[in-house]
Amino acid sequence: MSQIPSPNDPPPAGAVPTSGAPAGPSATPAPSPTAGFSLPEHRPAPTGKALAALAVGALGVVYGDIGTSPLYSLKECFGGPHGVHPTDANVLGVLSLVFWAMTFVVTFKYMSFVMRADNRGEGGILALMALVGKTETTRLGRRVLLMLGLFGAALLYGDGIITPAISVLGAVEGVAVAAPAMERVVVPATVVILVFLFLFQKQGTAKVGAVFGPIMLVWFATIAVLGVRGILHDPSILRALLPTHALSFFARNGWHGFLVLGGVVLVITGGEALYADMGHFGKRPIRVAWLGLAMPALLLNYLGQGALLLHDPGAARNPFYLLAPEWALYPTIAIATAAAIVASQALISGAYSLTQQAIQLGYSPRVTIRHTSQREIGQIYLPEVNWMLGTACVALVLGFQTSSRLASAYGIAVTGTMIVTTLLFHRVMRDRWGWARWKAWPLTVLFLTVDASFFLANVVKFRDGGWFPIAAAALVFTLMSTWKRGRDALALMLKDAGLPLDLFMADVARRKVQRVAGTAVFMTSNPGGVPPVLLHHLKHNKVLHERVILVSILAHEIPFVAEAERVNARELGSGFFQVIAHYGFMETPDVPALLDSLPRRALAGPRLTIVPMETTYFLGRETLLANGPSTIPTWRKRLFIVMARNAQTASAFFGLPPNRVVEMGAQIQL
């Protein structure tokens, strides 16, 4: 028999009204993403030392991906399968495209606009989807937004797989520049570094995380110095800042020039991380770190590489490392490798957070979530996700062999996510901010024109490796959408077959049911109904405990719920109590700790005291069959059943003590 999620899981965020009414997939969510909760108190923007500390911290988490792009970006523009010959005019044109891509996409689009669309301070594709989903009233509209958000999230997983592989590989390739005879050790060394990186994940990053920011600070300082050194040799490269060189590049190279955008886009990979990590550092530190250090350092380095190419077109084989003086080559390789590891860690941690959000929002099966820090709630470790990412990264390195080949696979995932973000952001402008069409549409069209240009330039790389992120995204999208549909169908079936709580309580008051000592806790996703496991228990055992607690864990489309609004409790009579706990999509519930905290909370309802050794938790353990009346295609039913069978058990997910859990089985035809 398989452990399925619906009877004991929190329902998908927004699917359950907070009033305590019967809930299910068809329940209409409140029109506000706050789900009836008060907004958090305004936090003053950090200044002085606090701002500087947060900005340095942001360097280690937010800018790892985009910060390591100089390792391979220009090499791809001039030496990739669609690269152009590094003539003076082409070098100036490509560098002009690099500057304006960074300025428009990162500074203008993300810094100035997208980062304003936060979900209670949190960013990212799923947080944005949850934010705009509340304003959509039509079923078709919500479905379209859901599909967009899930596909964007699926593309981010592809990005999370490629980034560690290409960053570490690009850094280690410097060894071949310093000693060409050592080229054969590049791939094995990269694999060893990645294996150790993923093995280390279970230890957490609480201790080493403090040095991530300083490492990236040294990295940005290093690439800035290297860039200045190159510019001083040929200051004429500064002409590339004029947009006329970008325009003349397209006019001169035509379609071939357009395809070079597939390499130029590599300089803005990681732009989505600015938005996704907004909740960790805040908008101001991220902006200060970008405008004050990251962007100037990156721009100086790209211009320095360009100056080198003006002087020596043959340096296109690896302009980053050839920019360094011979005596500094090995130290640069060491710093680059450290920066690549930091960039990889940021993407791995991002995949953990994305999965946690997907679980709480109802788009992913439960997996093991371990908190690796007692002080930082966001520091988590997901073993299943870690090993899947690690295996995929190593396979990519072994399959593609070079960062140049991997670059062909990189752009599609990044640009696809950018398009999804733009489409969802348009809904924020129209529905959340109330912008008129004449104001919102020109900005959306401008963003989409740039995003689509980068995307189309990368689509032609499909056979060269672009198939990988598309295949990975399609797989993740299929899994997430199947889980969502299966959960909704199952929740609806259980709701229709259930018994309203008020009718059950009236029946209990009339009947004389034998009571036994102790406390029984029944988990239910429907606060207005009776959990099926309670009905089965009463039918077969014909007894009830002296005290029965019905616990509902409700997930909401906000990142965090204030502790003052965490729990509602009330006495139902006849020894029954109801506890409804609210969690955001960035939180993980712990039911025993929750129940233990009830006496300390100032609740309008009763003050419940739980004695752990006198408490029994009852859960349903259902066997799913694919021959039921649901309209879901049979292949999706079977896939959902497999996913449910391999999901983490409800008892483990909610932190229930194994020796105090009783499971009762039943068959359900889906």
UniProtKB/Swiss-Prot annotation:
The organism's place on the tree of life at top rank: Bacteria
Record's subcellular location: Cell inner membrane
Functional description taken from the UniProt entry: Transport of potassium into the cell. Likely operates as a K(+):H(+) symporter.
Record organism: Anaeromyxobacter dehalogenans (strain 2CP-C)
InterPro entries: K+_transporter, K_trans_C, K_trans_N, Kup
Pfam families associated with the record: K_trans (PF02705), K_trans_C (PF22776)
Record-given protein name: Probable potassium transport system protein Kup
Cell membrane among keywords: yes
Gene: kup
